[in-house]
Amino acid sequence: MKELTLDSAVATLRAGGVIAYPTEAVWGLGCDPSHEAAVHMVLRLKQRPIEKGMILVAADLAQLEGWVRLQALPDARQRAVLASWPGANTWILPAGPRAQPWVTGEHSGIAVRISAHPLVAELCRAWGGPLVSTSANLAGEPPARRREELDPRLLRLLDGILDGETGGLAQPTPIRDALSGNVLRS
């Protein structure tokens, strides 16, 4: 497995690669959400149906410009979303023009999070935008909380791994619908 530095992780992403990196609760797989082939590789690696859509993670709200339409939410819902970030809160927001079907799946919204995890935020800043962030496990298998738990079947197919520690959350981040406030994953 190729060990990555922050700079080599960014170079790998720019080349359409898929990397593993630690997130708030579990290890994640990441790629450029604009790179269709890279997103399809993540879906194949995880054996995840495209219809489910993907989560994007960013360092700040500006990185989500064009990906989401926050202004389409009522003011109170906008305030609730913004008050929860940066943090371990994933929201389904109305999708913007940059959000392609290989990221949104069969949905009109897109799942996004502005992370407070130091390495995730640093990676997104170095990359210059949001990244796909999905748990580094095969569909139906438990997610890896520690690097040692990463599935060797996935590891050998990745373009590299950015080492670090997860943020210590007991569960993956909750997912809520920003329009309704409904919790989709707790």
Curated annotation (Swiss-Prot):
Top enzyme class: transferase
Entry keyword set: ATP-binding, Cytoplasm, Nucleotide-binding, Nucleotidyltransferase, Transferase, tRNA processing
Pfam families: Sua5_yciO_yrdC (PF01300)
Cell compartments where the protein resides: Cytoplasm
The YrdC-like domain, residue ranges: 3-186
GO biological process, one term: tRNA threonylcarbamoyladenosine modification
Catalysed reactions, as listed in the record: L-threonine + hydrogencarbonate + ATP = L-threonylcarbamoyladenylate + diphosphate + H2O
CC per GO annotation: cytoplasm
Disulphide bridges: none
Main localization (coarse): cytoplasm
GO MF annotations in UniProt: ATP binding; double-stranded RNA binding; L-threonylcarbamoyladenylate synthase; tRNA binding
PROSITE patterns for the chain: YRDC
Source superkingdom: Bacteria
Entry's EC annotation: 2.7.7.87
InterPro entries xref list: DHBP_synth_RibB-like_a/b_dom, Sua5-like_dom, TC-AMP_synthase, TC-AMP_synthase_SUA5
HAMAP family xrefs: TsaC (MF_01852)
Known function: Required for the formation of a threonylcarbamoyl group on adenosine at position 37 (t(6)A37) in tRNAs that read codons beginning with adenine. Catalyzes the conversion of L-threonine, HCO(3)(-)/CO(2) and ATP to give threonylcarbamoyl-AMP (TC-AMP) as the acyladenylate intermediate, with the release of diphosphate.
Family: Belongs to the SUA5 family. TsaC subfamily.
Protein name, as recorded: Threonylcarbamoyl-AMP synthase
Organism expressing this protein natively: Stenotrophomonas maltophilia (strain K279a)
Lineage: Bacteria, Pseudomonadati, Pseudomonadota, Gammaproteobacteria, Lysobacterales
Gene that this polypeptide is encoded by: tsaC
